[in-house]
Amino acid sequence: MTAPRWLASLACLALAPSSSALAQIAAPPVAPRPMAPAALTSQLQALGSGFNGRVGIAVQSVDGGWRTGWRADELYPQQSVSKFFVALTAMDAVDRGRVRLTDPVTLTRGDLTLFNQPIAQRVLGNGSYTTTVEQLLISAITKSDNTANDKLMRVVGGPGEVRRVIADKRLGAIRFYDGERALQSRIAGLTWSQSYSIGDAFYKARNALPMSLRRSLFNRYIDDPYDGASPYAIVDTLARLKRGELLSPSSTARLLTIMGNTQTGKNRLRGGLRPGWTLSHKTGTGQVLGGVQAGYNDIGIITAPDGRSYAVAVMIKKTSTPLIVRMNLMNNVVRAVIDQHNARFAGNLSL
């Protein structure tokens, strides 16, 4: 007796591998990440463990693929490091034809923010100021101008667009909040008012809050920063940028050139460079309460005279140590990377 067709079909289905099984069979093996130089790993661990504060350190070889660090999987406040992701989003928008670097942008008093905003002088002097997308990006990166950054963010689609780019490009453990006004107000325990953008109004409003409330919100931010990022995610993003995996060749080159002209943090990562080495970077500096600072960072790409590059991130979550000690830490991280490079490649440029 011939079996019913449905029974034969069922038998075939039973014998066929499931879609999940096929996926497992078809999935290529993930190549293990190359081992980082042991001496460098030991040096970074010594630097991190010896620092009086909560610090994360990460280094990744752009060319070799290895990475190493100290407490580099934790989330640290980005502060103005997040401007890098606004710039990345802007250049992505350029690549997709949504904006042009030459597009004019007009800022008014309603665009002003707080803290560091050099562009505010031009706005206040005339009531408005017209510039370009590119000049906003340059000011946001090289001067860490909060007003330029927030305006650029809105021009390219707002905080949601920055978060979309981070997610679509699979950049990892990186959070992005709603711009400098919202970020700094929330840390302080305030709801943003545009009146805070003028003079010392923000400081007065912040100082009027109960210290117990300010301390509670400040510590909550440090423990779970809503603009947090892990140093490993940062260096992986920087390495991918340098390799041309995130933007077009022209946009990659332009962004790295702008980052190479950063004027802030001249004695952070930059202070550890040896002759012939270059740095493209972005700093971040957070609010201080009771002598404790929430966020003191520098992230960037250092490039050797032979062209090999390393992504580096030093992110201090919480510390009250003197600035010179923090800068020395960053200097020493860079020197450790350069020393391992020279030990491996000096006199053997074919490797």
PLM feature spans:
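Positively charged n-region of N-terminal signal peptides that target proteins for export
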Residues: 1-5
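Bacterial N-terminal signal peptides
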Residues: 8-18
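Residues within well-ordered alpha-helical secondary structure of globular protein domains
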Residues: 12-13, 87, 142, 168, ...
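Sec/Tat signal peptide C-region and signal peptidase I cleavage site
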Residues: 19-23
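Structured C-terminal helix/loop/strand segments within mature extracytoplasmic catalytic/sensor domains
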Residues: 24-47, 154, 159, 219, ...
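Active-site-adjacent loops and short helices of periplasmic peptidoglycan-processing enzymes
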Residues: 25-189
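Active-site-proximal helix/loop microenvironment
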Residues: 77, 173-250
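Carbohydrate-binding/catalytic loop surfaces
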Residues: 129, 190-198, 279-286
